[in-house]
Structures are given as C-alpha cells and as structure tokens.
Amino acid sequence: MSDFWDRNKGSIMSGLATAGKQGYKGTKFVAKTGYKAGKQHYNSSKNKREGNSNNSSSSDLTISSPPPLTADVSNFPPPPVKPGQNQYHGSSRGGSGNVPPAATSRTSSTLPSSYSSEQNPIIPQIGNPQAVPYQVPAPVPQYTTADSQAPHIASRAATIVPGTQLPISSHPNNTAPATYNTRPVPLPHRAPDNNAAAGLVADPQLLSNTSLPRATRQLLTIDTASIATQNPNISQEAFAVPPANTMASPFPQTTHASYLAASQSPVQPESIASNKVSEPTPAVPAVPTRTYVRAPAALPVQPLPQEERQAMPQAMPQVMPQAMPQVMPQAMPQVMPQAMAQTSQPFPEENGVSDVQELKSPTSATTVKPYSWKDSEELKESLRIKIQNVDISSLPTPPVHRNRSESPSSETSSLRSKIKSRSQSPSGLKSPTQSTAVNLKTTETGKAMSTSRQTPQQTGRSSREGEGANNGIAGRYDSSVQVNFPPPPKPSRSETQTPANRDMRSSSSPPVKPTTAPRAPPRLPSRSVPSQPPVTSSVPKLSSTANGKADRENIKPKSAVSGAYNYDIKVDFQPPPKPFRKDKESSQQAPRSVPSFEKPSKYGPPPASNAETAQGRSIRAPPQIPSRAASLDPPPAYDSSHSHAPSAPPASNVELQSLSASSIQAGAEKTVKVAGSTIQIPKTKKAPPIKKALPGSLQALDTHKSNPEASAHLTEKGKKRPPKPAKKQSLMEQPNKTASNGGNSRGNFDQELEARLKSRSFHEKPAAVPSLVEHSNSFISSGKIKAAAPPVKPKIPIRLASNEALQPNEQAEVKDDSDGDNPFRRYLKNAVPSENDRLHKN
C-alpha cells in the first residue's frame, strides 16, 4: 500500500481539479442568480412602495398582458322593464382630462354614446332618415351650450352635405347610434314655425336660478317610448355642441329652452337636408363625453314658481312625444342665442362643482321637499313641539277634600293660633275639660280667621260642607262630651309598678327566696273601654301633650287588658317562675347528693339553721372541709334519681383544688361530741383511680350508671376534681347545732333520725338498670347514634420459611397480601404454581 499514492497521484489530482472547477462554476452561477433575483425583488418592492412601475431590469420577468377585450357597459341598451314599472336613470360619467368633472358630465342621460377624438375626424352628415334602420327607441337629441360667446358659434357653422346618413356604431353589443365628432357642430340657422316660437322658450330666470338645492338640479330626461312607436321612420340624430372655450366657462349649463321649443307640425326631410352648417376650428379640443341611453323615471323635483309654470307650455305632454325629433333642428338656432346670452356669465359655485336645475318629467307624480339649511338653534326651535300657553287664572279651582281645609295656609294659621293661646294661658293647671274648651275656642277663632281670607267661592264651599267647629275628622263632633280619659302610653315608657301591679303583688303569697321576685310584665297598649263612646279628635291630643305632667297625676289605674276588670277578686296564685339563669342556679342549687329528707318541697321549709349553714358553706367552704367527713352513719346508698338531673358544682368547690390530701387526713382524727358522748371520726378512704375518658363517639351517651365517686373527678374539660366526701356538711352540723340548744336537743335529734328513716322507707329500690355496655348497645341500635367505624386491620407480616429468593409471582403475591383490605386476595393467591428455584441453588 505504500506505492498507491505514487501510482494514482495523477488521476486523483486531476479529479480534484475538475471537481473544484465545476463546483466553482456552480457556486458562481447560484450566487449570480440569487443576487439578480434579490435585486429584482428589491427593486420591484421599492417601486411598489413608491408607486412607480417596474423598471427595465424586471421587465423580462413580469410581462404585462393587455386587458381582455370586453364590451363597454355604457354602450349596452337598458334592461327590460316590467309592465307598469318606471325605468331607472343612470348617472352620467365624464372623461378624464384637464377639465373639471363638473364640466365633463353635463350631458343628458338620454343621449347615445358619443366620442370625440382628434385622430378620427369624421363629420356626421344628415341624409335620408329612411336609410337608417331603426333598432331601438330613438333617444331625444340633447343640445348643450356652455360658451358665453354666442355670435362666434353662430358664425362658425359647418355645412352638412345632403344625401349622407349618420354613422351607426359598429359595436356588436351596441344597438344605440353613436356620433363621432372632432369639432363642435352647431345647428343650422333656420326660422322656426309659428307654433315652435309661440311661447315655448323657457324663462331666462329659470336658466339662471342656482339657488335651488343641489339634489334637485339634475339633468332633464324625457320619455321617448312614445316617439319610437309613433314615428318609426325618424332617423337617429345626435347633435352635440361642446363648449368652444372651456377655460373661459368651466361650468357649462344645459339650455332648457332647447327641449321646450317643440312644434306640432312635422318637418319634411328636404328641409333638413337643405341645411348647411359650417365647420369652425375649435380653440380647445372637445372633451370626450359618454352618456347612457336610459328610459326616464319619476324624479322628485322642487315645485317651480308661478312665473315659471306660466312660461312652460301646458300642452307639452301631448305635443313633445310627436313633434320633438322633427322640430328640434328648426327651433334650436333661434333659441340658442337667447340661452347663451343668459348663461354668458359664470355662476359662483363652491368647491368647483356646479349643478343644473332639473325639470319635472311628464311621468313624475311625486315631489320631495328640498333640504333647507338652518342653524342648529333655529333647527331646534323649528323641531320643538309648540305647546299653547294656558292662562291659569281662567281655569277653575281644583276640588278640595272634604276632610281638609282649602288652603294649607289656613291650617298652619289655625295651629299657630292654638299653640299661641295655649302658651299664653296657664293650661297646665287646668282640667282636661277646661283645656279642651280653650282648644275648641282657638279652633273656632282660627277657622274664622282662615275663612275670612278665603275667596267668596271658597267660603261658599266651606259653608256647604258644614260649620267650622263641628267639621271634625268624620261626622259631627259634640263638644259637650267629657273628655277625661288618659292619653295612650308613650312607646319608650319605662316599666313602672302601677297600683294594679302593687295590689297583685301584695295579695300573692311571699316567695320562698327573696331574689325570686317576679319581674313586672310589659304593659300592653291601653284600649278604650267599650262602655264609653270613642271620640277621636286632634284637640285632646294637643292638650295632653302640653299638659303631660298634670294629666299623669289625674290618671286612674287602668287595666292593660281590654274589658272591665274587677279589682275585688283576690289573686292568690303563685307568680310565674323566673327564667333560667345558669350563673344563679349553679350558686343557689342544692348539692347533688343531698338526702331526700332535707328537701323543702316535700317536707316543708328547712329550719333557719340549715339555711344559714348553707349560706355560710357557700362563702366559707375551705375551712369546713374536714367537718364533712364526720358522719354518724355510713354513706347512704347511691340514688339513681339524683344522677338524672346533674347540676353544676357550687362556685366554692373550685377553691378546693388547692387543698392537699395531708390537710384532709389531719382533720380526719377529730372527734365530735354528740349528747355528751365522744365519737371518733374514721379516716376517709382513698379516692378510686380515675377512669379513662370515653371516646368521642360515646361521650353523648347517658353515663349515669357508672360510679358517681369516680365520675365526680372528671370535669367537662377533663380536669381532676377534688375528692368528694361521703357525707354532706349538713348532716354533721345538725348534731352540733342541736347539742347547743339545751334540753330540746335530744328530741330534735330523734326527730331528725325518724325523718331520715321515713325518707329511706319511702324510696323504693331502684330497678335493675343495664350496664353501660348494654345501655350503649341499645342506644346505638335505636338509631340515635351511628356505630363507630371498625378498627383497621393490621397488615399481616409474611415471613418466609426458607431463605430462598422470591420469584416474580411470589413477589406479586406478597405485595397483594400486604393489602389487608383487598377483596381479590383469594383469587391472586397461587394463581401461578410456584416452582423451586432452579437458578439460585445452594
């Protein structure tokens, strides 16, 4: 392999050179092509941005194709019209040039398409009218004159060679004749007939009127449908006279007189052929104009003044369809100088746009009100609805309510007079009858004053309604009735003890406790006694408000309940119980395990000594704790009836938490002397161990069947309570009190023991109550509480009997077994029979 390079060196080098040359050529070609394409694209985009055409470099790529040869829409005939429908008008369009658009669009919409060109000088000549075939309804020739120099146009008349005919457009789709003029061709000067010149020239004021709105100054159109049907042999002739000097008069006007000069007598073809028109040399080339062949429609025009109506012929709708094409060449030479003289001066128009007045066509029957410019304020005033001003003094007075005065001023004056008279007179010391009489007098005077100010019509109405003083709220008011009943109570009146409440309280039996006095019930709204007739008037209310203190002193005790109340009946029933108050009841309620013989509700009120000791215990509870352990008898059997109504412990028991067990044991060895004998108090037993709290689902159960001594150590919040002695203090203090009484102490003690034995004999043995578990099960089964959720099963640990590695199926089995709640565990076990580990052998 060492001689490989030596043998192939030449071929390798020549191949590399050839490849390099070809690659260079290709790269160069690609670069040049890309550069050219980029440059052309940049230039084309630049020209597009600047609005220029494509430059020469991009002309070889973008070839502009000529537009397709389509027919000119302006040469088409109008579309067919339904019977009974008016044809629409097409808007005329003018060619583009240096002349303003207003000057190029002033030809009638009924003329055929006419083109003017310097390159095609064709002079139309009038020949035999029968030589021209009639294809479409002949349009009415239009003659436009806009030059102010009428004599020059008349002198430049071209001669029309007889025997020739008008050329017809060679366009395949155009059936309307077209006239191609290179220069203006004026009409021949010919004397018109008598009928044509007799009052058929339009009023000069009509031509010079430019104050009409722009919308109504449009081109004139004449219905030519009847012309074609009545005169089919008339040649289609078009005479167009463009302005000779466009710059001098850029706003050409249409001469209406040329349309109005018509005659009833037809003109012979020989007279038309004999006319000679000279062809003048125009100073300015004519602007090519294009018009549409359209049938007329009803156009709204402004109604002409009376003078213009008189100038127009009345027989125009009957004469024009028959004689217009024949008479127009005859009447035009005489009418044109007059029309040009009227339109010689240019009209001042805004924005370089002029308008031409439009005459009403014979078929139009509708008119539109022209727009008249007004200022915004004037327009608002004109559009505002005018309301006639009504004289208020001529209107009758409105009706007055029978329970009201006719004027509010009279009411206020009467009220002021009442207040003034009441303030001046010492009405507070008067009786209700006197104050009522004074108020009635002031009412009469105020009413008289108010009626004196009224008009005679008002006084007549008030006299018809009734007398001044007797005109009350409704009906007649009797001022002689004694009005001495008390006023109604105030809404914010405090609860005071009325004499009726005092009598009821004195007649009732005294309460057991001094703090259980019943609260006075709220007063009901007082109502009128049915024995007295109800008298409603505003006068007593005013007196009662002013003399409130004096009236309250004279108020007699009155019941809050409607109807007559007998105060002689003795009311001896007990007052209603006080509303429940937790703070007072907890401090005043008897202890939970008080023996039944001390209950005052069954065996009468307790002795005063017990009440005193109960009060003293509630105040000085801690020093008396050792004496609670002293007892003559063992603790009584637990009564289940007390546990059903558990009460909150006294407020003094909260202080017992600070006491230690040593102080209780130290006082346990004390002795008590009872009737000369010494009794040693045994030591108290230790408190039983505290039970654990029940779960949350069982705390709502009735747990009164448990040990009361154990449950007493648990408070609502789970705190430990102090150890509770077996006996209450009242049992230990009673012998001490009786021992100090003297000779009667022994008898009292025996009575206490007998009462105690009787109270024990009265109570029956409590019925066998099921245990807590049975009670809770029955409570749960009754549906009052839901059973607790079962405990979660612990995961079953799987221990392998051997140290062999687990196969994949065994691992999946172990994973499934780890889920204790998997119901499909039975189906996953041994799904695949296990095999011995043949790969990992020991």
UniProtKB/Swiss-Prot annotation:
Ranges of compositional bias, category Basic and acidic residues: 753-766
Chain segments carrying region Disordered: 1-25, 39-134, 338-368, 393-769, 799-842
Main subcellular location: membrane
Keyword Membrane: yes
GO BP annotations, alphabetical order: barbed-end actin filament capping
Gene Ontology CC terms: actin cortical patch; membrane raft
Family: Belongs to the AIM3 family.
Name of the protein: Altered inheritance of mitochondria protein 3
Organism: Lachancea thermotolerans (strain ATCC 56472 / CBS 6340 / NRRL Y-8284) (Yeast)
Gene name in the database record: AIM3
